[in-house]
Swiss-Prot record:
Keyword Nucleotide-binding in annotation: no
Name of the gene this protein is made from: guaB
SUPFAM superfamilies: CBS-domain pair (SSF54631), Inosine monophosphate dehydrogenase (IMPDH) (SSF51412)
Function: Catalyzes the conversion of inosine 5'-phosphate (IMP) to xanthosine 5'-phosphate (XMP), the first committed and rate-limiting step in the de novo synthesis of guanine nucleotides, and therefore plays an important role in the regulation of cell growth.
Top-level EC class as recorded in UniProt: oxidoreductase
Assembly, per entry: Homotetramer.
Entry similarity comment: Belongs to the IMPDH/GMPR family.
Protein name: Inosine-5'-monophosphate dehydrogenase
Upper classification of the organism: Archaea, Methanobacteriati, Thermoplasmatota, Thermoplasmata, Thermoplasmatales
Active site: 302, 398
Species in which this protein is naturally found: Thermoplasma acidophilum (strain ATCC 25905 / DSM 1728 / JCM 9062 / NBRC 15155 / AMRC-C165)
Ligand binding (K(+)): 297, 299, 302, 463-465
Description of how activity is regulated: Mycophenolic acid (MPA) is a non-competitive inhibitor that prevents formation of the closed enzyme conformation by binding to the same site as the amobile flap. In contrast, mizoribine monophosphate (MZP) is a competitive inhibitor that induces the closed conformation. MPA is a potent inhibitor of mammalian IMPDHs but a poor inhibitor of the bacterial enzymes. MZP is a more potent inhibitor of bacterial IMPDH.
Length: 485
């Protein structure tokens, strides 16, 4: 019995254990298609998801990710109301027709109008009385106005409008012809039913590959705890395109039971994790989830494998889960352990449909981590969601709690500042395209199906990195600090 535990032991592989074998190919990197699914019904043009960590993804990151063609998941280590508001901000950031329009009444004092525009970061407000459009007021209208004035004193009353079924080309023509920036949409009774802005149209044209829903809004995911059905309902109502049920060990009887209940209440896609085995994949699939999140302990800030002695090397975990899920058509997201763009190529070749990133995005301008200067270099705070800091600020249901204390499964630290997230994504996608070109994969499915691995030795790994030279500068897609000790 005990001896068999070692005589029948299996072998696990991770990113530094293997390389992909180059193939004869006619595929050029610039021509490959990197679009993929991150859940049953969510397709993105860039197969990268920002992790729902409180030092990685809030609304600014989610907006930047979606604009690039990737997607972000808002973290849940905050009050429900704040997460809901972040989801709403992402959904409002870009849209052809704004349905949930901020409005104001004619009697509103000018000071209140100014405050509302500033807090909502908007330049104008439709003026509504008895649910009917009676005017519009902009920041420009509020300049040099005497105190004590009301909106009715300065608003534009002769408002140019369009019917609610106007098409986008006609709306652009109306905006251009009348030299206006906002076009209210009204029904036959004069009720305000929507708003089209020139800013949103220009932004849409600027980001043609953005991840958008059927209404033209940016797509976003929201993380919820496995037992927080109320939060799941609220973020779905706010517009979340999919939900990530966020727990360290999803193959747990209580979690599985809760997932089945959540499935009955939630209509958007549900991505569940984290898991690391084929059996776990089968268990989650039986709960009718729409995506699988793979990775127990591979992250740079995770100590689960050391503290608990549990985990599966990430490439083996990915391949085992992907094998179990392949007939179901449910996508697999590889979460954790990725340090270079080449690791993304390996993860997909092992069976993943997309990857989830934490540390590689934590140092970007859009991440919410605190900035700091260490030895003259700029860094941003980054911590695991199993760190004491994260656990004590609210995320106690993701990891173990024994008695009155927490069992930490993560650490807190800092990562080098890396600039804007679009610059990082450009390098990562470029590496993915290059890798696909080497192995002759024109699509993500080709890479999953045809990628072949060779196992390498420690000497092979050393040979793979720059050697026999003193580096005097780091290229944007290679950091010396990422090399394993």
């Amino acid at each position: 019995m005990y001896r068999e535990k070692f005589t029948k032991i299996t072998e696990g592989f991770t990113f530094d254990d293997v390389l992909l074998i180059p193939m004869r190919t006619a595929v050029e990197p610039k021509n490959v298609v990197v679009s993929s699914r991150i859940s049953r019904h969510i397709q993105v043009k860039v197969p990268i998801v920002s992790s729902p960590m409180d030092t990685v993804t809030e609304d600014a990151m989610a907006i930047a990710m979606a604009r690039y063609g990737a997607i972000g998941v808002i973290h849940r280590n905050q009050p429900r109301e704040k997460e809901v508001e972040m989801v709403k901000r992402v959904k409002r950031e870009e849209t052809i027709i704004i349905r949930d329009v901020y409005t104001i009444s004619p009697e509103t004092p000018i000071e209140v109008a100014r405050t509302l525009m500033a807090t909502r970061n908007i330049a104008g407000l439709p003026v509504v009385k008895d649910d009917k459009l009676v005017g519009i007021v902009t920041k420009r209208d509020l300049e040099f106005v005497k105190k004590g004035s009301s909106v009715s004193d300065v608003m534009v009353r002769d408002v140019i409008t369009a019917p609610e079924n106007v098409d986008i080309d006609e709306a652009i023509e109306i905006l251009h012809k009348n030299r206006i920036e906002k076009l209210p949409l009204v029904d036959s009774s004069g009720h305000l039913v929507g708003l089209i802005t020139a800013k949103d149209i220009i932004t849409r044209q600027k980001f043609p590959d953005a991840s958008r829903d059927s209404e033209g809004q940016l797509m976003v995911g929201a993380a919820v705890g496995p037992f927080d059905l109320d939060r799941a309902v609220e973020v779905e109502k706010a517009g979340a395109d999919f939900i990530v049920v966020d727990t360290a060990h999803a193959d747990n009887e209580n979690v599985l039971s809760s997932l089945k209940k959540m499935r009955k209440q939630i209509s958007v896609d549900i991505v569940a994790g984290n898991i690391a085995t084929a059996q776990a994949a089968e268990d989650l699939i039986s709960c009718d989830v729409d995506g699988l999140r793979v990775g127990i302990g591979p992250g740079s800030i995770c100590t689960t494998r050391i503290v608990a002695g549990v985990g599966v090397p990430q490439l083996t975990a990915i391949s085992d889960v992907a094998e179990a899920a392949k007939d179901s058509g449910i996508p697999v997201i590889a979460d954790g352990g990725i340090r270079y763009s080449g690791d993304i190529v390996k993860a997909i070749a092992a069976g993943a449909d997309a990857v989830m990133l934490g540390s590689m995005l934590a140092g970007t301008e859009e991440s919410p981590g605190q900035e700091m200067i260490i030895n003259g270099r700029k860094y941003k705070a980054y911590r695991g969601m199993g760190s004491i800091g994260a656990l004590t600020t609210g995320l106690s249901d993701r990891y173990s709690k024994l008695g009155n204390g927490f069992i930490a499964e993560g650490v807190e630290g800092a990562v080098p500042y890396r600039g804007r997230v679009d610059e990082v994504l450009f390098q990562l996608v470029g590496g993915l395209r290059t890798g696909m070109g080497y192995v002759g994969a024109a699509t993500i499915e080709d890479l999953k199906r045809n990628g072949k691995f060779v196992r390498i030795t420690n000497n092979g790994l050393r040979e793979s990195h720059p050697h026999d030279i003193r580096l005097i500068s780091e290229p944007p897609n290679y950091q010396i600090s990422n090399i394993s000790p």
